[in-house]
Amino acid sequence: MTSRQSLIVAMLTAVIALAPAPSFSHSLLVRSQPGQRSTVTRPPERVQMWFSERLEPAYASASVWNEAGKRVDAGDASVDQNDPTLLSVSTPNLGPGRYTVRFRVLSVDGHVVESSYIFTVRAPAR
């Protein structure tokens, strides 16, 4: 192999090694209010969830369920227009108890993520 061919091979190897790799990440839940596995003494008016990527509003859903398996949210889950990583749903009149938040989102990379987490509302101390 000539020195010119060796130089070309070395340059091509460097270009391939330094090229950015495609991203294969999915939209991950990075923060929520109430937090995952948290206990609060004041019932939230809304459950809010922030994700690692922008969400597709038409394919995002969230629901809140009580211990008896009854849906207790207002059915108004939506992606925030000013923050496309924020999905929230109203939770009127939550009493003390354990709640499960279920969500399903489609991120702009085309991947569906479906999961759930719990939080607890505890009666305030008297």
Regions found by a protein language model. Give the residues of each.
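A glycine-anchored, Pro-Gly-centered beta-turn/N-cap motif
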Residues: 90, 95-104
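N-terminal edge beta-strand
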Residues: 24-43
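Bacterial N-terminal signal peptides that target proteins for export
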Residues: 1-11
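Aromatic sugar-binding surface patches on proteins
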Residues: 82-88
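Extracytoplasmic/periplasmic copper-protein system
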Residues: 26-30, 110-126
